[in-house]
Amino acid sequence: MIEYIIGKISYKNNNYLILENNFKGYKLFMSDPNIFEENSSAKIFVYTKIFQNNKNNFLFEYYGFKTLREKIFFENLLTVNGIGPKTSLTILRNDLNLLKELIRNEDIESLSVLEGFTNKTALSIVSALSYKLKNERISEYNNDVNHSSINQQSNSYNPVPDLVSALKALGYKKNMIEKAINLLIPQLSNVSEDQISDLISQAIKIISDEAVTNKTTVS
């Protein structure tokens, strides 16, 4: 099996990219191909799916990941009943450290508003992976080149549960909360509890701006 490919990115769109290596072009489905630039060189970790078509021919489908940690988490997701490769890629559009922390903490409510999740999906993933991820916390230090950032992330305050609870209490719907949190994810690392009010205000503004935009479009 291919573990990773080093090559040149010849094409990309929102769903996949084509990586050239040794005069071959590999179509790699990814959660976010746009993190790479066309015509640049890259090392991409690969998961290979092998299946048969209706003519009993064996076909190969490739999924790409920027880091080994992403690939390992993707493979963990595939062990969950009802979770396939496409759903797993959608889930990986969320911050990986945040996902792992919420799963370890069995925080169904916070997971269910993230991209790729429903309440049923969140429950299935937590039931299947929470114990495993708790036991694998130490091994992550061997799979990531930036040990200090993981340590800092795991010890920091996680504002997502408080943010979700506050927005739900204010009457906002799941899809609104999901969009706001996904837009705020870059700001959610290394925040303190006294900043939660500011985050709630920012989330409300995002939701309000979205509502105005949709109303203008309809008009």
Swiss-Prot record:
- CDD domains listed in its UniProt record: UBA_RuvA_C
Keyword Phosphoprotein listed? The answer is: no
Q: Which SUPFAM superfamilies match?
A: RuvA domain 2-like
What Gene Ontology molecular-function terms does this entry list? ATP binding; four-way junction DNA binding; four-way junction helicase activity
Q: Which GO terms describe its cellular component?
A: cytoplasm; Holliday junction helicase complex; Holliday junction resolvase complex
InterPro entries the UniProt entry points to:
DNA_helicase_Holl-junc_RuvA_I, NA-bd_OB-fold, RuvA, RuvA_2-like, RuvA_C
Region annotation (Flexible linker) ranges: 149-154
Q: Where is this region: Domain II?
A: 67-148
Origin superkingdom? Bacteria
* Listed GO biological process terms: DNA recombination; DNA repair
Chief place of localization: cytoplasm
- Summarize the protein's role: The RuvA-RuvB-RuvC complex processes Holliday junction (HJ) DNA during genetic recombination and DNA repair, while the RuvA-RuvB complex plays an important role in the rescue of blocked DNA replication forks via replication fork reversal (RFR). RuvA specifically binds to HJ cruciform DNA, conferring on it an open structure. The RuvB hexamer acts as an ATP-dependent pump, pulling dsDNA into and through the RuvAB complex. HJ branch migration allows RuvC to scan DNA until it finds its consensus sequence, where it cleaves and resolves the cruciform DNA.
Q: Which family does it belong to?
A: Belongs to the RuvA family.
Which protein are we looking at?
Holliday junction branch migration complex subunit RuvA
Which species is listed as the source? Malacoplasma penetrans (strain HF-2) (Mycoplasma penetrans)
Q: Gene for this protein?
A: ruvA
